[in-house]
Amino acid sequence: MTVEGVNPKAYPLADSQLSITILDLVQQATNYKQLKKGANEATKTLNRGISEFIVMAADTEPLEILLHLPLLAEDKVFEFLLIVSLSYESQLVVSLALASFTGFTWVSSSYDKKIRLYWLLDSSFEIVIVDNVPYVFVPSKQALGRACDVTRPVIACSVTSNEASQLKSQIQHLKDAIEKLLI
Amino acid sequence: MLVLFETSGGFALFKVLDEGKLSNVEDLGTEFYSAESARRMGLHKFLKNNCDDGEILAVADPKLGDIITEKLDIECVHNDAVMELLRGVRSQLTELLSGLDDNDLAPVSLELSHILARYKLKITSDKVETMIILSISLLDDLDKELNTYTTSVCELYGLHFPELANIVQDNILYAKVVKLMGNRINAATLDFSEILADEVEAELKEASMVSTRTEVSDLDLMHIQELCDQVLSIAEDKTLLCDDLKNKMNKIAPNLTALVGELVGARLISHCGSLWNLSKLPWSTIQILGAEKTLYKALKTKQATPKYGLIYHAPLVRQAAPENKGKIARSLAAKSALAIRCDAFGNGQDNTMGVESRLKLEARLRNLEGGDLGACEEEEEVNDKDTKKEADDEEEPKTEECSKKRKKEAELETVEDPAKKSKQEGVTGLLLLMLLISLIYFFSVNQLLW
C-alpha cells in the first residue's frame, strides 16, 4: 500500500495492523447482518442513530463524496428531558444544576458520557448527551468491498448496533482503538 | 543566542546578552520601520540576513525550528527557559519595539484571528448561499407579478382589439405590439417588422381593419401603455436576475449546475437552507425533496410514494418519456448527491465530475428509449432490477412511519387471541355433541335387540 499518495483529508487513517482488524470485524458484521454498505445507507444509519462506527476508504476518487460522513458522525446528539423526582435522579439533577451554573461540562460516572445541562426559560431544563460516532479511514476500497462480501469496491460502510450481538465486546474494543488515533 | 519572536504584525529577532541568566534582552535594530518593507520580506530572507554562522536560535515552535534547521543550517533550541523568555518578551513587546504600541497591535491581531478562524473552519467568504436563496425567491415573485400584469394587459386591450390575443401568442411580444400600435386604426400604417414576422404582421393588419369592437379613449390607451411598460420592465429584470443566478450557481455549485441546471440547483439549496445541509442528505431524500406532503399522505394511506419532487423540472427528467421519468429521476438524484458533496467539500471550481455524470445519464436515457429488438431481454432484466430497487427504496421510509402502526397491529393481535380460543371451544363442543348422539343411537339399538 502506497502511503505517499493518500489524501491528507482522509483522517484518521488506520495503519496496516488496525486496518486488518477493522476489515475482519466488518466481515464478521456482514455475517451477523450488522452492516450497512455504501455511503447512502451509512448516512441513513447516522441519521437514525443506530450506527456503532463508520469505515471509509481513503483511496476514493474524489474523496469529497464521503466527507459528509465525518460531519454527521460528529454531530450526533441525543436529547431528552429529565423528570424531577425524589430519588436518585433528584440528586443527579442537583449536581447537574451546579455544574451548569459553573459553566463546566459535567462528566458523570453513572452515564459514562459527556452531559450538558441547559436551563430553559420555563424553569425546566433539557439534558443533552453528546455521543460522537467514531469514524476511520482504511487505505483500500477494494479490500473494503471484499470484507463486505461485495464484488464491487465499497467506499463507506457502517456497523450497526445490536445489544444482543456476540460482536459487542469486539466492537467496543475497536471503537476505543479508533478513538486513540485521534489523540 | 538569538530569539525569534512571532507577533501578529510580523517577526522580531532579539539578542540575548547574558545567556547564563537569560535576562537583559536588547533590541537588535530589527524594527519594521514601514509596513511595506515588512510585508515584502519573508522569514527565509529575514533569517538569512540577520543570523551569523554558529549562532543558536531560540524558537517557540519545535516544528518550525526543525524546518529552519533543515533549510538554513541554523541550530534551533526549544525548552522551558526559552518559553519563559518569550513570555517576558511578550509582556514588554511595546517597549522593546520602537514605534509600536497597543493601539496599533490590536487591529492587526484581530485581522489575523479572523483569517486563522476562516482557514480552520474552511469557510470561503465567497461561497455564501443566502444570495442564491433570496434570488430564487425573488425570481418566483417576479414570475407571478409578470403573469398578473400580462393578464391585465390582455384583458384591457381585448375590449378594444380581441383578435390580437389569437394572432400574437407570446406575452412579451403582445406588450410590445400594444405599446407600438396604440389605437388599432394605426396598425395599417405602422411597421411591425422589428417585433413580428411578415405573415403575422399581415394577419394583424388585416384583422385591425375588420374588427368591430368598441373604440378606446386616449386616457385608457395611456394607462394600457404604461402597464405595457411595467410588463417589459419586469421581464427585463427577470432576465438580468436569471443571468446573475446562473453566474452565482456556477461559482458556488458548478457540478450540481452542470447536472440539473441552475434553477433546479438553486431550488434544492433554497429548500435545505444551505449547500452544507444539502450535502448531508442521502440521494433518496434528494429525489423527493419538494414532495413531502405527497410522501406523508402516501405513507399514511399506504399508496405509492412519489418518484420525484423538485428534481422533476431538471432538463434530463423533462426530456425523458413518461415511463422512464422515474428511472432517470432516481439516477439523476444519485449523481446529484455526489456532485453536491464535491461542491460542498471541494475547494476548486472544477465541474468535470458533473459533466461526466451528465454524459453518462444522457447515454442511459438514449439506451432506455431507443430499444432495439436484440436488446429486449437485457431491457427486461434491467427493468426487473429497477423494480426490485424501487420496492426496496419504498420499504425503508415505510418502516420509519409504520412503527406506530405495528404497535396497533400488535394490540389487534392480542385482541384476536380470544376469538381463536372461542373458535377452539366451538370445535370441542361440536365433538362432544357428536359423541353424545352416537351414545344415544347405541342405546336405542340395544333396546330394539332386547
From Swiss-Prot, chain B:
Residue span(s) of domain Nop: 252-370
Disordered: annotated segments: 375-423
This protein's record includes keyword Oxidoreductase: no
MF (Gene Ontology): snoRNA binding
InterPro entries: Nop56/Nop58, Nop_C, Nop_dom, Nop_dom_sf, NOSIC
Source domain of life: Eukaryota
Subcellular location: Nucleus, Nucleolus
Matching PROSITE patterns: NOP (PS51358)
GO CC annotation terms, alphabetical: box C/D methylation guide snoRNP complex; nucleolus; small-subunit processome
Ranges of compositional bias, category Basic and acidic residues: 399-423
Matching Pfam families: Nop
This protein's UniProt keywords: Nucleus, Ribosome biogenesis
GO biological process: one example: ribosome biogenesis
Chief location bin: nucleus
Family named by the database record: Belongs to the NOP5/NOP56 family.
Function: Required for 60S ribosomal subunit biogenesis.
Official protein name in the record: Putative nucleolar protein 5-3
Species annotation: Arabidopsis thaliana
